[in-house]
Amino acid sequence: MLPMITGFMNYGQQTLRAARYIGQGFMITLSHTNRLPVTIQYPYEKLITSERFRGRIHFEFDKCIACEVCVRVCPIDLPVVDWKLETNIRKKRLLNYSIDFGICIFCGNCVEYCPTNCLSMTEEYEFSTYDRHELNYNQIALGRLPMSVIDDYTIRTIWNSPQTKNGVNPLI
């Protein structure tokens, strides 16, 4: 008789514990009902990236001294640096610089270790192409100024929305 009573007590305790867990989950679900949705409609709306976002690499040809530090610190030896030694001034002259973003892992080592700061990470992240060879950027493509996400039309429309003006930030 005693084992049967303890079995019923254990069953009752387990039932109460399960009901409490279900209630906790339901309360979490209810607490999310008054929040704004986090999902955005990507092609039409874009999130503002953080300051430390690692996007497309921007390259300034005039600052580069062809030291090849970026190639040495890259885990996959990605940047291709072509240079020629100028014998009259005994310095390297940069001929060509290219990065294939189809292979790049966006680790940021090249930007961090560059002694002349000719490399920087931008907030550009849209690299969609139909041909993977278009992802190989030379110094001209790397040197073009990136379009800032904040200047994008969709960001400006979200920022000027009535929800933002009422003190509710739709991006958070």
Curated annotation (Swiss-Prot):
Q: Please tell me where [4Fe-4S] cluster 1 binds in this chain.
A: C64, C67, C70, C114
Give one GO molecular function term. NADPH dehydrogenase activity
Keywords of the record:
4Fe-4S, Chloroplast, Iron, Iron-sulfur, Membrane, Metal-binding, NAD, NADP, Plastid, Plastoquinone, Quinone, Repeat, Thylakoid, Translocase
Pfam families recorded: Fer4_9
- Write down the chemical reaction(s) this protein catalyses: a plastoquinone + NADH + (n+1) H(+)(in) = a plastoquinol + NAD(+) + n H(+)(out); a plastoquinone + NADPH + (n+1) H(+)(in) = a plastoquinol + NADP(+) + n H(+)(out)
Q: Which family does it belong to?
A: Belongs to the complex I 23 kDa subunit family.
- Cite the record's note on assembly: NDH is composed of at least 16 different subunits, 5 of which are encoded in the nucleus.
Q: What does this protein do?
A: NDH shuttles electrons from NAD(P)H:plastoquinone, via FMN and iron-sulfur (Fe-S) centers, to quinones in the photosynthetic chain and possibly in a chloroplast respiratory chain. The immediate electron acceptor for the enzyme in this species is believed to be plastoquinone. Couples the redox reaction to proton translocation, and thus conserves the redox energy in a proton gradient.
- Which HAMAP family is this protein grouped with? NDH1_NuoI
Question: What is this protein's name?
Answer: NAD(P)H-quinone oxidoreductase subunit I, chloroplastic
